[in-house]
Amino acid sequence: MAAAGPAAGPTGPEPMPSYAQLVQRGWGSALAAARGCTDCGWGLARRGLAEHAHLAPPELLLLALGALGWTALRSAATARLFRPLAKRCCLQPRDAAKMPESAWKFLFYLGSWSYSAYLLFGTDYPFFHDPPSVFYDWTPGMAVPRDIAAAYLLQGSFYGHSIYATLYMDTWRKDSVVMLLHHVVTLILIVSSYAFRYHNVGILVLFLHDISDVQLEFTKLNIYFKSRGGSYHRLHALAADLGCLSFGFSWFWFRLYWFPLKVLYATSHCSLRTVPDIPFYFFFNALLLLLTLMNLYWFLYIVAFAAKVLTGQVHELKDLREYDTAEAQSLKPSKAEKPLRNGLVKDKRF
């Protein structure tokens, strides 16, 4: 396997900073970079794209074909596998309508996160334990190792599919607009980080985010399966409770602790030490910061749910992002209006 760079810096892996050190050093590095940029503007951006971006048309075509492939595969899996399974298990109608979406996402994110974990812990890549190493030996147009390129193709094409799926296939939720923005930002980050050869940090970002989606969809599946066929299944209820606790913990630990202190610290501060004139520094850090803000936004849902459980307002697990029955009825179009279908699930609500 091609090595991505030295396993450590001259003095070994740098200790992970505190939040205060991240803000102080990251902000200081950004200010220094802004002051030192004497020709910042569209001219510099155009030169940077011409000199440092390497993305061939066949690669974009492959990405688009992959997105179409994911969409076709999901439609086939929903019709041939997930819906028949929901019917055979006698799920309640509302749960049976939502189960295919969660099953699809659970299988994808379980596979993608497992592969990212393999790259970070089953190979020689040192990026998790030594995040600054993501920029060691960086050069414009450097070769992308095949194992990382495969991960990028799978993830990039899936997020291309997810933009379409959020609009036309998924259940419409209170955060669907933010989810759509998240998918667009993620796709831009995947494509641009590949073009500028920041793929090493990209693998770390994907690893730190996908685990929460695995646990979220696992929990939702067990919620759907705990009441079926006129019976209450305690094993699924227990799995849902444990999954909910694990999901909340992993969201904070992976997305709000490790992600800023490993990824944002490396991109905002350490990158300039390794590559002083690193191209599109502000562009990538702005997108990563936006991703952090969206992680905080969704964490508020987790905190709100925990508060409702502790105060006795909620007695069973539910997705606070989903519209309840009363809201759904009030948001449905009148009979005289043309109904807007949300893909395979239900009416879409704006």
UniProtKB/Swiss-Prot annotation:
Chief localisation class: endoplasmic reticulum
Pathway connected to this protein: Lipid metabolism; sphingolipid metabolism
Record-annotated membrane-spanning stretches: 53-73, 103-123, 148-168, 176-196, 239-259, 287-307
Known EC number: 2.3.1.299
Any matching Pfam family: TRAM_LAG1_CLN8
GO CC terms, sorted: endoplasmic reticulum; endoplasmic reticulum membrane; intracellular membrane-bounded organelle; membrane
Alphabetic keyword roster: Acetylation, Disease variant, Endoplasmic reticulum, Epilepsy, Lipid biosynthesis, Lipid metabolism, Membrane, Neurodegeneration, Transferase, Transmembrane, Transmembrane helix
Membrane topology: Multi-pass membrane protein
Residue intervals of the TLC domain: 97-311
Activity regulation details: Inhibited by fumonisin B1.
Sites bearing N-acetylalanine, chain numbering: 2
Annotated GO MF terms: sphingosine N-acyltransferase activity
Post-translational modification: Acetylated. Deacetylation by SIRT3 increases enzyme activity and promotes mitochondrial ceramide accumulation.
Effect ascribed to mutating residue 68 to M: In EPM8; uncertain significance
Keyword Nucleus: no
Compartments, record wording: Endoplasmic reticulum membrane
Reaction(s) this enzyme catalyzes, per UniProt: a sphingoid base + octadecanoyl-CoA = an N-octadecanoyl-sphingoid base + CoA + H(+); sphinganine + octadecanoyl-CoA = N-(octadecanoyl)-sphinganine + CoA + H(+); hexadecasphinganine + octadecanoyl-CoA = N-octadecanoylhexadecasphinganine + CoA + H(+); sphing-4-enine + octadecanoyl-CoA = N-octadecanoylsphing-4-enine + CoA + H(+)
A biological-process GO annotation: ceramide biosynthetic process
InterPro entries linked to this entry: Lag1/Lac1-like, TLC-dom
Keyword hit for Disulfide bond: no
Enzyme kind, highest EC tier: transferase
Protein task: Ceramide synthase that catalyzes the transfer of the acyl chain from acyl-CoA to a sphingoid base, with high selectivity toward stearoyl-CoA (octadecanoyl-CoA; C18:0-CoA). N-acylates sphinganine and sphingosine bases to form dihydroceramides and ceramides in de novo synthesis and salvage pathways, respectively. Plays a predominant role in skeletal muscle in regulating C18 ceramide and dihydroceramide levels with an impact on whole-body glucose metabolism and insulin sensitivity.
Disease: Epilepsy, progressive myoclonic 8: A form of progressive myoclonic epilepsy, a clinically and genetically heterogeneous group of disorders defined by the combination of action and reflex myoclonus, other types of epileptic seizures, and progressive neurodegeneration and neurocognitive impairment. EPM8 is an autosomal recessive form characterized by myoclonus, generalized tonic-clonic seizures and moderate to severe cognitive impairment.
More info: This protein is produced by a bicistronic gene which also produces the GDF1 protein from a non-overlapping reading frame.
Protein name in UniProt: Ceramide synthase 1
Taxonomic source organism: Homo sapiens
Recorded name of the encoding gene: CERS1
